[in-house]
């Protein structure tokens, strides 16, 4: 099922399984995974997109190999909070995953995640060219970590 509300998503996640974070792009997808305790988001990879079918198959392999039970995808709202064309593409992509693999997905506001990823790389003295290669997975980590932090608050 697709959730736009983290509060509802938290109620349905399997806490014994890991959570995958995705920073969706038209050319690349940044991927992060939670640790086994669902406390920390860890960078996994940047997947270069090929075709919808191949993309879904590759993601499926990753979530089977890593015991993933749910997914968080960055929701690319405009700075004003308005949905844009990329938001529609994210929803279509998420619905394809749900239809094919019956997994719960949460769309989470990703405003500023790419800017924060770029800033973190700069602070770490990573060259711009190297930074561009990892920005997507850093963004995926930031998106996923925000949701993991919300889950922690609910568990207190």
Curated annotation (Swiss-Prot):
Which domain of life does the protein's organism represent? Bacteria
Q: Which SMART domains match?
A: YqgFc (SM00732)
Q: Does the keyword Protease apply?
A: no
Q: Which GO terms describe its biological process?
A: rRNA 5'-end processing
Coarsely, its chief localization is cytoplasm
Which cellular component appears as one GO term in the record? Answer: cytosol
Cited SUPFAM superfamilies = Ribonuclease H-like
Alphabetized GO MF terms: nuclease activity
Pfam families membership: RuvX
Function recorded in the entry? Could be a nuclease involved in processing of the 5'-end of pre-16S rRNA.
Q: Please give the name of this protein.
A: Putative pre-16S rRNA nuclease
């Amino acid at each position: 099922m697709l959730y736009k509300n983290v509060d509802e998503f938290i109620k349905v996640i399997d806490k014994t399984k890991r959570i995958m974070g995705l920073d969706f792009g038209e050319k690349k997808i940044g991927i992060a995974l939670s640790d086994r305790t669902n406390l920390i988001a860890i960078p996994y990879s940047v997947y270069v997109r090929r075709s919808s079918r191949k993309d879904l198959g590759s993601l499926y392999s990753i979530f089977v190999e890593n015991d993933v039970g749910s997914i968080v995808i960055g929701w690319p709202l405009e700075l004003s909070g308005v949905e844009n064309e990329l938001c529609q593409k994210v929803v279509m992509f998420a619905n394809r995953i749900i239809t094919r693999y019956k997994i719960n997905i949460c769309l989470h506001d990703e405003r500023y995640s790419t800017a924060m990823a770029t800033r973190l790389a700069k602070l770490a003295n990573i060259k711009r060219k190297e930074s561009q290669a990892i920005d997507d997975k850093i963004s995926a980590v930031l998106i996923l970590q925000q949701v993991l932090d919300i889950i922690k608050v609910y568990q207190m």
